[in-house]
Amino acid sequence: RINLGSSCVSALRMDELFDLTGEDLDAFLNEMRTMSLHYHHGDATGSPRIKAAVAGIYPKGNVKPEEVMITHGGTGANDLVLMSVLEPGDNCVVIKPSYQQHYDIPKGSGIETRVVQLKAEDNYQLDFDALDKACDANTKMIVLTNPNNPIGVTLYDEGLRKVVDIA
C-alpha cells in the first residue's frame, strides 16, 4: 500500500537494510570497530560556540553549555529523544495525527507502537479512555503534539493532567 500523503520513506531496521543491499552486516560492523576516526567534522553534540549561545539565553548558571545538545532539525531531536528513552520490549503510544517520525522512528527500531486516533466524530478531542486502554506496564512513552499538528486541537491543564495520570 502506498500513502501518497506521506512525507517520509518507510523506516527500515538495520537487518532489513542489509538484506536489501546484500551487504554483510558482520563485515560492516567489524569495519566500523576498526575504522580510524582521526578526521573530524565537528562535535557531534553541536559546536561549543552555538551551545554557549543557547545556554546564554537562560538565566546565568541555570543551563550550562555542556548540557545543551544541538541536533540536525526537529526530526533529529525527535529521534534522539525517542531512541534515548525506548528500548526493546517497551511500547509507546502515539496520538495521531502527528508527525510521521513520532510513530515511524520507534516502529522502525522494533518498538511496539500503539496509536490513539483523534476522530472527527469526537471533534478531534482526545479519548482518554482509549488512551488509558492503549497503555500498559510496558508503555514507556506517550507521544503527542500540543497543540496538535496538523489539527490544532489543544490540551489545556486539565487534559494534560489526565495524560500525566494515565502515564
What are the residue ranges of the model-derived segments?
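Active-site phosphate-binding strand-loop segment of PLP-dependent enzymes
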Residues: 120-167
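Short, solvent-exposed loop/turn segments at secondary-structure junctions
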Residues: 7-11, 75, 99, 148-150
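N-terminal small-domain helix-loop-helix segment of the aminotransferase-like
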Residues: 1-73
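Generic structural signal for small/hydrophobic residues in well-ordered secondary structure
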Residues: 4-7, 54, 68, 92, ...
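Short, acidic/turn-prone active-site loops that include or flank metal/cofactor-
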Residues: 98-99, 117-123
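Conserved PLP-anchoring active-site segment centered on the Schiff-base-forming lysine
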Residues: 66, 84-106
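Glycine/Thr-rich phosphate-binding loops of Rossmann-like dinucleotide-binding domains
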Residues: 12-14, 78-79, 102-103, 151-152
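A short helix-loop-beta submotif of the ANL/AMP-binding
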Residues: 108-114
